[in-house]
Amino acid sequence: MTYLEIDGVEKLSGEVIISGAKNAALPLIASSILAKNEAQISNLPNVADICTLLSLLKNLGASYTFENNFAKINTKDLNKTIAKYDIVRKMRASILTLGPLLARFGNCEVSLPGGCAIGQRPIDLHLLALEKMGANIEIKQGYVVASGKLKGADLMFDKITVTGSENIIMAAALAHGKTRLLNVAKEPEVVQLCEVLAEAGLDIKGVGSDELEIYGTSGELLEFKPFKIIPDRIEAGTYLCAGAITNSKITLKNVNANHLGAVLAKLEQMGFSFDISEDSISINPAKEIKPVEILTSEYPGFPTDMQAQFMALALRANGVSIIDERLFENRFMHVSELLRMGADIRLNGHIATINGTKELFGADVMATDLRASSALILAALAAKGTSKIHRIYHLDRGYENLEEKFKNLGASIRRLEE
């Protein structure tokens, strides 16, 4: 097992290039199941979750090449419809193959998913929508077994679901007739999926809103055009927090500030300022790091995937910060590890109260999920002494070239063997 060893630093400086968004790439890779031709994807991050999903497609009969952040995926010879547990267990996003497989073949079996252990994250909403589209759904021995010819339907998600929206959009693409989807997630990653499918010939209206009309092709596969993955707004937010927690000036390249509205607003409230251009953001040091109140919510609200990083940052604030986590239960598992570093944090249900300005000290800590891992890195940068972060396979699922990017900013960070 490998771990990261990080020395606390006074300041960071320099530039970091933001990778393509993993959470945009995953549904788009799954959507290649709907393609009659080769899908060509650029700016694809080389992280573990991407490689896992590509392996799953290969296991189903597809072929692909992937190098220098560019992939070609050919699903013409895809001839299997069982997404097996040994691959799916590695990450929850594998469930995104359910909608397109069922739409294309009329039957499939997809193992119930794995991934980060942050709450239930049920797929009930996916299954209910597919049933309303005419699918027969059973859960057998840990698999979702689905069959049936999909028909357009009027659907409304009881709660906003990103992967649910993506799955049903892909299912509706090849269905017979019109699907009307209400309460759709509006995340930039969902929007890009819709835009790519529209470019491929799908008649889809309302892109970017919470109401979509999708006119299915009755089984006819789509003609994909080459496309480029949007920048990763969560990776960008993480590096902005790295600049903030060390009160440094750093610059992010290949970033879309329009996707970071809530994150930038909270950093401004904490005293930081920015220089923003078309594809770059520079964060400037604060005269004083102020406390902040954060309520996580669906896009365009404050992203739950940035909650842990802001908790680490709030430890440097001059006062008491409040974080109210409304989207997932069990998403404060990083708190016990931050306490080991000297943090003063109190939990009451889904609300965390963070007392800032206390000194942090290097310690041995354990990553519990992807975003919690990045929070521990941020805390280690601001701590006195050396920290060791264990179970970093979580980081490798979602952050590309993390050590190199931090080293380029002046961090003292090493990957070592246990």
UniProtKB/Swiss-Prot annotation:
Subcellular location: Cytoplasm
PANTHER family: UDP-N-ACETYLGLUCOSAMINE 1-CARBOXYVINYLTRANSFERASE
Keywords: Cell cycle, Cell division, Cell shape, Cell wall biogenesis/degradation, Cytoplasm, Peptidoglycan synthesis, Pyruvate, Transferase
Key word Cell division present: yes
Reactions it catalyzes: phosphoenolpyruvate + UDP-N-acetyl-alpha-D-glucosamine = UDP-N-acetyl-3-O-(1-carboxyvinyl)-alpha-D-glucosamine + phosphate
Organism per entry: Campylobacter lari (strain RM2100 / D67 / ATCC BAA-1060)
Name of the top EC class for this enzyme: transferase
Similarity comment: family membership: Belongs to the EPSP synthase family. MurA subfamily.
InterPro entries: Enolpyruvate_Tfrase_dom, Enolpyruvate_Tfrase_sf, MurA_subfamily, RNA3'P_cycl/enolpyr_Trfase_a/b, UDP_GlcNAc_COvinyl_MurA
Name this protein carries in UniProt: UDP-N-acetylglucosamine 1-carboxyvinyltransferase
Pfam families in the record: EPSP_synthase
Modified-residue entries (2-(S-cysteinyl)pyruvic acid O-phosphothioketal), positions: 116
Residue positions of the active site: 116 (proton donor)
